[in-house]
Amino acid sequence: MCSVPISQTVRRACLLALCFGMAGVAPVRAADEQFESWTAKGQSTYIWQQKPGFGAAYSGQNSLSTAREKSYTFTATGYFGVRPWSGGEVYFNPEVTQGSAFSNLSGLAGFTNGELTKVSGTNPTFYRQRLFLRQTFNLGGGREQIESDLNQMAGMVDKNRFVLTVGNFSVLDVFDDNAYAKDPRTQFMNWDNWSYAAFDYAADSRGYGWGFAAEWYKDDWVVRFGRMTGPRQPNGLPLDYQIGRHYGDQLEVERGYSIGELPGKVRVLAWRNRAILANYNDALTYGLTNPGDPDHQWITKVRTGEKIKYGFGVNVEQAVAKYAGVFLRAMKADGRSETYAFTEADASLSAGVSLDGGAWGRGKDTAGIALARNMLSPDRRNYLAAGGISFFIGDGALNYRGENLFEVYYSLNIWRKVGLSLDYQHVQNPAYNADRGPVNFYGARLHAEF
């Protein structure tokens, strides 16, 4: 993969420095302020990664390159919000992105950088990331403080409440939260660790869509339901706005609890997509009956008719000490249809530990270590083994094994809300193929909020 031209590197460094400078001079409300009627915040993140060359018995159209490669992403985002009336909040997020992926973003299920979903090339791209309304209806049960954060204004709400979010946002803004493994800009970088890899949630190729989400908070329980638009074509950028016909539904139940004085949460999630998708058995039949077709992306030849795709998952976060917590995610999808909007996994499992630097006198530092495993359904395995090419993966053959990940990171706070992270990832059986790899990835991340 070509290196980034010097001029682009200089421009990117200058923009990042400007953002970091703003972190020191931009007006920010005091942390102890109890109410905000408006908010203006931002973030800037640069992630650089490198992988050495690795061994493989063979390579195909959508294989991870065996050569040494570099990858990077840069994002800068504005978070603007205002309260137009009681209980109402309107948010607008513009964002600029640029970057370059390993092997044109192919050859893995668990990609190594969560920011890669947003970039579309080495030229800066400006777009509207989010534009949504959040309305809170207070229902009693006592009051609690909401802290100021990105897309969140400080204020008091009832413990029992109904919250409606409508507009342009991400499924992951509302569902599948986790205190220890959620944000690739500050925590684990790999896709396996900031959501379920098998959660094929409806969104455009950047991870956003239009729709609604309703949340009912009652004591230690939360029930959420949402419907979102998906892409016109699987993993495409243009959205299909026929939300009554093609959509992704999510239902999540959350229970908060404590073991002694150590808090924890369990979330159970069910999702269901309806869209025009290819069935893997149909695609395999096409490939076997048309051996002369040079295009082995057979899924595109049978992408007719509406299909239902669904899955179930459980998400756990648990503090185990004052400065330590653990997380677990497990999900199983039906695995009959092609990937709709996320990555190539039909079952996924991830677990890890997060450590707060307060344990060693560095209260704003964080460290984490995690293991993950992704798996494929028999239908998808057979398709790939016969030489079929999917959206992200396809080696031309398949000696199937689960794709395994080990990730460890350390995030060092270097000034105010500026952090520098080092990250290492080891992937065994990339794209589920025991004939390729293993692969090592080394990364660094610079992140600022202002």
Predicted region positions:
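Residue-level signature of outer-membrane beta-barrel architecture
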Residues: 33, 82-84, 94, 135-137, ...
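Transmembrane beta-barrel strands of outer-membrane/channel proteins
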Residues: 40, 44-48, 92-96, 164-168, ...
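Signature for the C-terminal beta-barrel architecture of outer-membrane proteins
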Residues: 191-316, 323-326, 330-337, 344, ...
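Outer-membrane beta-barrel "beta-signal"
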Residues: 129-142, 369, 438-450
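Short loop/turn motifs that connect adjacent beta-strands in outer-membrane beta-barrel proteins
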Residues: 31-40, 52-53, 81-90, 138-161, ...
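Surface-exposed coil loops of outer-membrane beta-barrel proteins
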Residues: 106-123, 127, 142-248, 252, ...
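Surface-exposed strand-loop-strand hairpins of Gram-negative outer-membrane beta-barrel proteins
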Residues: 50-73, 178-181, 435
